[in-house]
């Protein structure tokens, strides 16, 4: 594939092109890259010819097809046109696995090629209910997604407890209470009330970092923004039993937002850096912003517990860069 991404990456490397995936290249830069791709593919094609001979593989190399030739390109465009007309090729917005280095999304099969163990933050923080003097204890492994936070999820069928800790009332998943208290080394606490997750539905909360993110503060004025939602996918066996939902960075989160007509706030560019819409976090690569967000939570008295968690996480099979889940407008070839 002369213009395949692996070939383009190799050509960029040989040409000394950095950040070559950007769309603001000049016409001459595009021509140079195309020429570099042709040179690269022909160089390695000769090596593959020799490998075929060494393995005793008989192929008609004189009749090889090249993807940069007009007859191939025209046939591909014809097929794509037909797919679009038949509704097979569609354009839409979805959460995809995205490589910040290659600047491209990956398919499910590509994502499954690159899982490895990583250490991520395990962050417990608290948010105050707007109309009650109570705090939701929320868990996340990706602090940067607090910038795009829209909802907090509970499981409708599971039990949650209101717990008095010193002068505050915390709301946490019942089966997670004991472990959370042990992690915090809290022995003196009192369970005041037990409720189902469904009973917390619709309660509005105050995001602790709104002063840092003015655009998010505007979204927060909407009635269906920064509210508790009860959804069956919420896992009460990890964290605090409550999870924050970021439609810009999670598939379940996104689907929940679409179902509930919640607007999606996504101040993240193609390089996976926060844009001006992210306020004080503007310009940060999203994962680099994790530490600053933790510090800001701590300064506001909203950080409950910080730790680390080791888990499997996907990386790009081409460049080994950790992927980021982003809501993006993409083209999809529908197979079912």
Ranges and model annotations:
Residues 148-269:
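Catalytic alpha/beta core of large soluble enzyme barrels
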Residues 288-313:
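Phosphate/diphosphate-binding loops
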């Amino acid at each position: 594939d002369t213009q395949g991404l692996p070939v383009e990456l190799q050509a960029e490397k040989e040409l000394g092109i950095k950040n070559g995936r950007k769309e603001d290249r000049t016409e001459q830069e595009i021509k140079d890259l195309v020429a570099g791709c042709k040179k690269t593919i022909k160089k390695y094609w000769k090596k593959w010819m020799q490998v075929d001979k060494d393995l005793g593989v008989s192929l008609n190399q004189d009749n090889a097809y090249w993807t940069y030739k007009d007859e191939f390109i025209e046939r591909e465009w014809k097929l794509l046109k037909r797919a679009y007309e038949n509704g097979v090729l569609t354009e839409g917005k979805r959460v995809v696995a995205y490589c910040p280095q290659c600047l491209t999304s990956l398919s499910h099969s590509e994502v499954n090629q690159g899982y490895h163990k990583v250490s991520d933050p395990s962050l417990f923080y608290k948010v105050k209910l707007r109309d009650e003097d109570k705090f939701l204890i929320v868990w996340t492994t990706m602090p940067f997604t607090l910038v795009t936070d829209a909802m907090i999820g509970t499981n409708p069928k599971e039990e949650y407890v209101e717990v008095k800790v010193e002068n505050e009332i915390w709301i946490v998943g019942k089966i997670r209470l004991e472990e959370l208290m042990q992690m915090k080394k809290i022995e003196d606490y009192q369970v005041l009330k037990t409720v189902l997750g469904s009973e917390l539905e619709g309660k509005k909360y105050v995001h602790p970092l709104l002063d840092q993110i003015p655009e998010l503060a505007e979204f927060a004025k909407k009635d269906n923004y920064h509210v508790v939602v009860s959804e069956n996918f919420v896992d009460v066996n990890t964290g605090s039993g409550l999870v924050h939902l970021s439609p810009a960075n999670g598939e379940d989160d996104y689907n929940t937002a679409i179902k509930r007509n919640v607007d999606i706030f996504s101040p993240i560019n193609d390089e996976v850096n926060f844009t001006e819409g992210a306020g004080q976090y503007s310009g940060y690569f999203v994962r680099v912003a994790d530490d600053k967000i933790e510090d800001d939570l701590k300064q506001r008295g909203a950080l409950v517990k910080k730790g680390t968690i080791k888990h499997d996480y996907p990386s790009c099979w081409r460049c080994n860069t950790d992927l980021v889940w982003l809501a993006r407008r993409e083209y999809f070839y529908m197979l079912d």
